[in-house]
């Protein structure tokens, strides 16, 4: 008499992401090794390179030294106005920029790329998928997949032989 007097469940569940603490710790250690050096904008000098990601709901910004250290970062909602959000970051960075440092180049990507590039006369625009792939490859050489969960969609990039092989897009994310 299976289940007589007892509630039964037919709900299927996935196995836990990690079998035990040791597996979780190994994962954390492996991923902690993938880091980008950082520095302080106040002590930076020489050419700096600025990247903006003008997304549909947020704006992200990093300023990097010529050797790739992040000296400034910003992440915030854009209130539906990527140009206004970008202007706020411009003001923030310009006020903090030391006298012996200068912005040598700026690149923008994301949903608001064209608007921000035109409004702020940004040097270059980059297709978002290429920006994500290049960043992933810089952090983890030999990367084979990149997943981008954005405000408008979600993309899964597959990489083969150092080039984008395929892109799958879910057209409704948030």
Model-derived segments and spans:
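Flexible inter-domain linker/hinge segments
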Residues: 1-51, 55
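Phosphate/pyrophosphate-binding loops at sites that engage ATP/ADP/AMP, CoA/4′-phosphopantetheine
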Residues: 90-104
């Amino acid at each position: 008499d299976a289940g007589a007097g007892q509630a039964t469940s037919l709900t299927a569940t996935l196995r836990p992401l990690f079998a035990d603490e040791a597996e979780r710790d190994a994962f954390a250690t492996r991923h902690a090794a993938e880091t980008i050096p950082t520095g302080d904008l106040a002590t930076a000098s020489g050419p700096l390179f600025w990247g903006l990601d003008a997304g549909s709901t947020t704006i992200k910004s990093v300023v990097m030294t010529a050797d790739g250290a992040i000296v400034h970062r910003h992440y915030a909602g854009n209130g539906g106005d990527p140009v206004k959000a970008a202007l706020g970051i411009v003001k923030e960075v310009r006020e903090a920029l030391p006298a012996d440092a200068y912005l040598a180049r700026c690149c923008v990507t994301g949903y608001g790329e064209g608007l921000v590039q035109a409004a702020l006369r940004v040097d270059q625009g980059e297709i978002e998928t290429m920006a994500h792939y290049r960043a992933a490859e810089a952090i983890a050489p030999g990367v084979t997949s990149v997943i981008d969960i954005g405000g408008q969609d979600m993309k899964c990039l597959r990489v083969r032989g150092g080039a984008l092989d395929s892109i799958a897009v879910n057209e409704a994310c948030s």
